[in-house]
A protein has these predicted regions:
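Generic structural signal for small/hydrophobic residues in well-ordered secondary structure
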Residues: 24-25, 134, 191, 233
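PAPS-dependent sulfotransferase catalytic core
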Residues: 1-89, 206-221
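Short linear functional motifs in flexible/disordered or boundary regions
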Residues: 40, 44, 50, 108, ...
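Anion-recognition interface
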Residues: 60, 71-78, 100-123, 151-152, ...
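PAPS-dependent sulfotransferases, especially Golgi type II membrane carbohydrate sulfotransferases
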Residues: 1-16, 143, 164, 193-248
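PAPS-dependent sulfotransferase catalytic domain
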Residues: 89-202, 224
Length: 248
Protein backbone atom coordinates (compact mmCIF):
# COMPACT_ATOMS: atom_id res chain seq x y z
CA UNK A 1 0.00 0.00 0.00
CA UNK A 2 1.46 3.37 -0.98
CA UNK A 3 1.80 6.37 1.28
CA UNK A 4 -0.97 8.25 -0.50
CA UNK A 5 -3.45 5.44 0.07
CA UNK A 6 -2.78 5.07 3.78
CA UNK A 7 -5.66 5.62 6.13
CA UNK A 8 -5.83 9.04 7.69
CA UNK A 9 -8.34 8.25 10.41
CA UNK A 10 -5.53 7.75 12.95
CA UNK A 11 -3.97 11.17 12.39
CA UNK A 12 -3.88 13.04 15.70
CA UNK A 13 -2.19 16.30 14.80
CA UNK A 14 -1.40 18.58 11.91
CA UNK A 15 2.14 19.95 12.13
CA UNK A 16 3.10 23.41 10.93
CA UNK A 17 6.42 25.23 11.13
CA UNK A 18 6.78 28.94 11.81
CA UNK A 19 9.90 31.06 11.54
CA UNK A 20 12.25 32.07 8.75
CA UNK A 21 13.86 30.57 5.73
CA UNK A 22 17.43 29.34 6.24
CA UNK A 23 16.96 29.06 9.98
CA UNK A 24 17.20 25.28 10.30
CA UNK A 25 13.63 24.36 9.43
CA UNK A 26 14.75 21.89 6.76
CA UNK A 27 17.06 20.01 9.12
CA UNK A 28 14.44 19.95 11.86
CA UNK A 29 11.71 18.70 9.55
CA UNK A 30 14.01 16.07 8.06
CA UNK A 31 14.77 14.63 11.48
CA UNK A 32 11.08 14.40 12.28
CA UNK A 33 10.30 12.95 8.87
CA UNK A 34 12.62 10.05 9.72
CA UNK A 35 9.99 8.99 12.26
CA UNK A 36 7.72 6.21 10.94
CA UNK A 37 4.53 7.94 12.09
CA UNK A 38 5.35 11.50 10.97
CA UNK A 39 4.81 12.60 7.36
CA UNK A 40 6.01 16.07 6.36
CA UNK A 41 5.73 17.66 2.92
CA UNK A 42 8.82 19.71 2.18
CA UNK A 43 8.39 23.32 1.00
CA UNK A 44 4.69 23.37 1.77
CA UNK A 45 2.35 25.50 3.84
CA UNK A 46 -1.41 25.06 3.90
CA UNK A 47 -1.73 28.85 3.82
CA UNK A 48 -0.49 28.97 0.23
CA UNK A 49 -2.92 26.37 -1.10
CA UNK A 50 -6.69 26.16 -1.24
CA UNK A 51 -8.33 23.19 0.39
CA UNK A 52 -12.01 22.73 1.11
CA UNK A 53 -11.69 20.04 3.74
CA UNK A 54 -9.24 18.47 6.14
CA UNK A 55 -9.39 15.10 4.36
CA UNK A 56 -8.53 16.75 1.05
CA UNK A 57 -5.51 18.46 2.64
CA UNK A 58 -4.16 15.36 4.40
CA UNK A 59 -4.58 13.07 1.41
CA UNK A 60 -3.01 15.67 -0.89
CA UNK A 61 0.09 15.80 1.31
CA UNK A 62 0.45 12.03 1.49
CA UNK A 63 -0.06 11.62 -2.25
CA UNK A 64 2.52 14.31 -3.08
CA UNK A 65 5.07 12.73 -0.76
CA UNK A 66 4.61 9.39 -2.51
CA UNK A 67 4.61 10.85 -6.02
CA UNK A 68 7.71 12.99 -5.57
CA UNK A 69 9.80 10.73 -3.38
CA UNK A 70 8.65 7.21 -4.24
CA UNK A 71 8.06 6.56 -0.57
CA UNK A 72 9.90 8.48 2.12
CA UNK A 73 13.01 9.55 0.22
CA UNK A 74 13.13 13.32 0.43
CA UNK A 75 15.65 16.04 -0.25
CA UNK A 76 15.99 18.26 2.79
CA UNK A 77 18.29 21.25 3.08
CA UNK A 78 20.81 20.08 0.53
CA UNK A 79 20.92 16.39 1.44
CA UNK A 80 18.78 13.38 0.67
CA UNK A 81 18.06 10.93 3.44
CA UNK A 82 17.55 7.22 3.09
CA UNK A 83 14.15 5.90 4.16
CA UNK A 84 15.65 4.56 7.42
CA UNK A 85 15.17 0.81 7.15
CA UNK A 86 12.60 -0.49 9.60
CA UNK A 87 11.54 2.99 10.68
CA UNK A 88 9.41 4.19 7.77
CA UNK A 89 6.00 3.37 6.45
CA UNK A 90 4.13 3.48 9.74
CA UNK A 91 0.57 4.60 10.30
CA UNK A 92 0.35 8.39 9.87
CA UNK A 93 -0.20 9.96 13.30
CA UNK A 94 1.18 13.40 12.44
CA UNK A 95 0.95 15.02 9.00
CA UNK A 96 2.18 18.46 8.08
CA UNK A 97 4.21 20.76 5.89
CA UNK A 98 7.49 22.60 6.22
CA UNK A 99 7.86 26.13 4.88
CA UNK A 100 8.58 28.22 7.97
CA UNK A 101 9.38 31.47 6.19
CA UNK A 102 6.46 31.04 3.80
CA UNK A 103 4.05 30.58 6.69
CA UNK A 104 5.37 33.70 8.43
CA UNK A 105 5.07 35.71 5.21
CA UNK A 106 1.52 34.50 4.57
CA UNK A 107 0.41 35.42 8.08
CA UNK A 108 2.13 38.79 7.78
CA UNK A 109 0.50 39.62 4.44
CA UNK A 110 -2.87 37.92 4.88
CA UNK A 111 -3.61 37.30 8.58
CA UNK A 112 -7.23 36.25 7.98
CA UNK A 113 -5.90 33.08 6.33
CA UNK A 114 -4.85 31.91 9.78
CA UNK A 115 -8.42 31.46 10.97
CA UNK A 116 -9.70 30.32 7.59
CA UNK A 117 -7.21 27.47 7.26
CA UNK A 118 -6.14 26.51 10.76
CA UNK A 119 -9.55 26.83 12.39
CA UNK A 120 -12.10 26.29 9.62
CA UNK A 121 -10.43 23.69 7.36
CA UNK A 122 -8.13 21.77 9.69
CA UNK A 123 -10.31 20.23 12.37
CA UNK A 124 -7.70 18.19 14.22
CA UNK A 125 -5.41 19.98 16.70
CA UNK A 126 -2.52 21.86 15.10
CA UNK A 127 0.94 21.57 16.61
CA UNK A 128 3.47 24.29 15.86
CA UNK A 129 7.26 24.12 15.86
CA UNK A 130 9.25 27.32 15.79
CA UNK A 131 12.91 26.96 14.82
CA UNK A 132 15.06 29.80 16.10
CA UNK A 133 18.56 30.52 14.83
CA UNK A 134 20.92 33.25 15.97
CA UNK A 135 19.32 36.33 14.35
CA UNK A 136 22.68 37.73 13.24
CA UNK A 137 23.43 34.50 11.36
CA UNK A 138 19.93 34.22 9.91
CA UNK A 139 19.93 37.82 8.69
CA UNK A 140 23.40 37.39 7.20
CA UNK A 141 22.20 34.35 5.27
CA UNK A 142 19.32 36.43 3.87
CA UNK A 143 21.88 38.77 2.30
CA UNK A 144 23.47 35.84 0.50
CA UNK A 145 20.15 35.40 -1.31
CA UNK A 146 19.60 38.84 -2.87
CA UNK A 147 18.64 40.85 0.23
CA UNK A 148 20.43 44.08 1.09
CA UNK A 149 21.56 44.25 4.75
CA UNK A 150 19.05 46.86 5.92
CA UNK A 151 16.21 45.18 4.05
CA UNK A 152 17.15 41.82 5.54
CA UNK A 153 17.06 43.24 9.06
CA UNK A 154 13.69 44.85 8.41
CA UNK A 155 11.95 41.79 6.95
CA UNK A 156 13.44 39.51 9.60
CA UNK A 157 11.79 41.39 12.44
CA UNK A 158 8.54 41.88 10.54
CA UNK A 159 8.34 38.10 10.25
CA UNK A 160 9.21 37.87 13.93
CA UNK A 161 5.88 39.55 14.68
CA UNK A 162 4.08 36.67 12.94
CA UNK A 163 6.10 34.21 15.00
CA UNK A 164 5.21 36.05 18.18
CA UNK A 165 1.49 35.89 17.42
CA UNK A 166 1.60 32.13 16.86
CA UNK A 167 3.70 31.42 19.95
CA UNK A 168 1.40 33.47 22.15
CA UNK A 169 -1.84 31.84 21.02
CA UNK A 170 -1.14 28.33 19.72
CA UNK A 171 0.16 24.96 20.91
CA UNK A 172 3.81 25.48 20.07
CA UNK A 173 7.39 24.89 21.12
CA UNK A 174 10.59 26.69 20.21
CA UNK A 175 13.64 24.73 19.10
CA UNK A 176 16.94 26.58 18.92
CA UNK A 177 19.06 25.40 16.02
CA UNK A 178 22.20 25.65 18.10
CA UNK A 179 20.73 23.34 20.76
CA UNK A 180 19.47 20.91 18.13
CA UNK A 181 22.95 20.60 16.65
CA UNK A 182 24.60 20.28 20.07
CA UNK A 183 22.11 17.79 21.54
CA UNK A 184 20.05 16.29 18.69
CA UNK A 185 18.76 13.35 20.73
CA UNK A 186 17.44 15.62 23.48
CA UNK A 187 15.80 18.11 21.12
CA UNK A 188 14.29 15.50 18.80
CA UNK A 189 12.86 13.65 21.81
CA UNK A 190 11.36 16.93 23.03
CA UNK A 191 9.73 17.56 19.66
CA UNK A 192 8.35 14.02 19.49
CA UNK A 193 6.90 14.43 22.98
CA UNK A 194 5.24 17.62 21.76
CA UNK A 195 3.77 15.66 18.84
CA UNK A 196 2.65 12.74 20.98
CA UNK A 197 4.69 10.04 19.23
CA UNK A 198 6.95 7.43 20.79
CA UNK A 199 10.65 7.22 19.98
CA UNK A 200 13.25 4.46 20.01
CA UNK A 201 16.96 4.55 20.66
CA UNK A 202 17.68 3.56 17.06
CA UNK A 203 15.62 6.45 15.73
CA UNK A 204 17.40 8.97 17.96
CA UNK A 205 20.79 7.51 17.05
CA UNK A 206 19.98 7.83 13.36
CA UNK A 207 19.00 11.47 13.85
CA UNK A 208 22.25 12.19 15.66
CA UNK A 209 24.28 10.69 12.83
CA UNK A 210 22.97 13.10 10.18
CA UNK A 211 23.39 16.35 12.14
CA UNK A 212 26.52 18.36 11.41
CA UNK A 213 28.95 19.05 14.24
CA UNK A 214 28.43 22.76 14.79
CA UNK A 215 26.19 25.62 13.63
CA UNK A 216 27.37 27.83 10.81
CA UNK A 217 28.25 31.28 12.14
CA UNK A 218 27.65 33.16 8.91
CA UNK A 219 27.70 36.54 10.67
CA UNK A 220 31.50 36.42 10.59
CA UNK A 221 31.62 35.86 6.83
CA UNK A 222 30.63 39.42 5.85
CA UNK A 223 31.99 42.88 6.59
CA UNK A 224 28.80 44.95 6.59
CA UNK A 225 27.93 44.44 10.27
CA UNK A 226 28.58 47.99 11.44
CA UNK A 227 28.18 48.98 15.07
CA UNK A 228 24.92 50.71 14.18
CA UNK A 229 23.46 47.57 12.61
CA UNK A 230 24.65 45.36 15.46
CA UNK A 231 23.07 47.71 17.99
CA UNK A 232 19.81 47.89 16.05
CA UNK A 233 19.49 44.10 15.95
CA UNK A 234 20.44 43.86 19.63
CA UNK A 235 17.66 46.32 20.46
CA UNK A 236 15.16 44.38 18.33
CA UNK A 237 16.15 41.04 19.89
CA UNK A 238 15.18 42.40 23.30
CA UNK A 239 11.59 42.82 22.06
CA UNK A 240 11.12 39.07 21.57
CA UNK A 241 11.42 36.66 24.48
CA UNK A 242 12.12 33.71 22.19
CA UNK A 243 15.32 35.42 20.99
CA UNK A 244 16.63 36.09 24.48
CA UNK A 245 20.35 35.53 25.00
CA UNK A 246 21.47 35.77 21.39
CA UNK A 247 24.52 37.95 20.76
CA UNK A 248 26.72 38.84 17.82
Amino acid sequence: MGVGSKRIDKVKYYLSFIGWGRSGNSLTAALLDFHPNIYIKNEFTALQERFKSQDQLLRWILQRIEKKTQGRWQAWGGFTHDPFKGMTGGVPLVIGGKKGGGTSNSLMNNPELFTKIYDDVIKIPVKWIHVQRNPYDNITTFTKHNWKPDGAIDIYFKQAESVKKVLSSRDSITVRLENLIKNPKVEVKRMCDHLGVDVTGNYLKHCKNVVWNKPRKTRFSVNWWTKERKDLVKQKIEEFDFMGGYKF
